[in-house]
């Protein structure tokens, strides 16, 4: 029987630090071995690079995005597969699922790496050390946030009193029990407020800064439906002057840019050419180079539901992220099974490499739409519409293509307008299922896809037990203090 992941992290060389120490391709997140003493500022900086490397580990980044994309309604799986994406897509979860087992392990490994640095730095020793401590506090909270989204029910269900995940704020060799969702959220907020006060260096979007902490705070408060606070922290990012929305034409190539060269990106996980994971890259299921046909599987496509939404406005710049595949001779739409091949390219073509990208975690557009959603819920309708239209104008829309308070174009409510715009702006960026369920909305697939028994219709209610994942079986076997999800 394998020991519990959290328990054994104290006994092993830090996974992420050792990887980045021995492989140049993990730069700029390079680090020292965990066995090296953390004595000097240089040691702590190296260990901090190791903490960043933790969120870059393949089973962290890949599973983070796939587990956040496949349960939604923007993707269409085109056939049966033995890959764990089948379970993610069809909601056929089970305790020994590879995706959850691997992500749980790597997320707590990343938390452990951050905790090592946090424990070594006293507040106020120096601005440089305060900065490092703040960065590690953010990294610790980012992993807690992703974990509680996967394994704890939406905060809005039960006011956060449902069971969440174990909070891990130290490197002790223990067997923690699960905290409530509210306890996890409160912990993250306290951490992030401290982190934002400690970080005084405006690092680029490969690294944490106080604005990155504010971005996560805005999202957390939005999930909690503490709308005034969500607006407050969105404003702090927007008004910082550090970021700007890309213009319409450059925006069409947004995801091919290095994050540090992109004025809109707040935080991203930086990959370089040596990192190219080919058929194990995030985008390998969503794209295959139409010229070589040898860069990915390309078996999961943009859903017809999403395409119908985009097609309402043919001049929407966001069409650029979808590539319809046609027969070169007849021009007919290509299909796999009953699913039209709409490739999605948000994880492709950085540095001219088909499967290379630096996945974006936070960008400025989200701050505008966080603010819009919060204002919609507060009844500040004009403010909500104004922010939605900022995003639509950037997408190249104008005139009657914009909303007014008196013309919602059949959407029914300001909130529906905002949520639809979030779908258009962030498709395949890992937000859609959470946006639905935290707003007590069902996930409805009314399009062709390998959904399970019905290949044209599939619905999941927000209260369905399968909205969240099982705690990994090996963790349950080793830790008697854990309680399994129903």
Where are these regions (language model features)?
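Extended ligand-binding clefts on enzyme/binding-domain cores
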Residues: 224-225, 231-352, 357-363, 414-433, ...
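Conserved, well-structured interaction surfaces
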Residues: 83-150, 179, 194-200, 352-359, ...
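Membrane-proximal, proline-rich intrinsically disordered regions
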Residues: 22-68, 297, 311-314, 399, ...
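Bacterial Sec-dependent N-terminal signal peptides
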Residues: 1-32, 486
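Short, surface-exposed recognition loops and adjoining beta-strand edges that mediate ligand/DNA contacts
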Residues: 33-35, 62-79, 153-161, 201, ...
